[in-house]
């Protein structure tokens, strides 16, 4: 490893604990807000009481990442889904879940069935996957709230 890479790695590791705590706190606050939203059928966040796996999480963990999902009550068609996902200010559509930025993606039940045909699909709406980054949590909630207004 060259000196620059070692320096950047060392610098990043010094703040890792603070960043992970912030991911946990912010993602839990967003999950709690989503759990109360009338357009949300279910929130899948391990630190959220009532979520599948919460007892396991409570027994074995003290924090969580910023990655979780929720299910919309409505199954969005392709046009509605594109309108929903394409107009966020703070959330980007991407698969790079390990960074500091907030991300959003969607999966329809039929897409998941193609990947995991042996499992049962436990929802009829639209599954939205989130990674909650280090942006202000109230700004993230406001951005999600504006997204719900686009769902007719």
Which residues does each PLM region occupy?
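PLP-dependent enzyme catalytic core of the Aspartate aminotransferase-like
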Residues: 74-76, 102-152
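Active-site C-terminal subdomain of aminotransferase-like
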Residues: 1-67, 71-76, 80-106
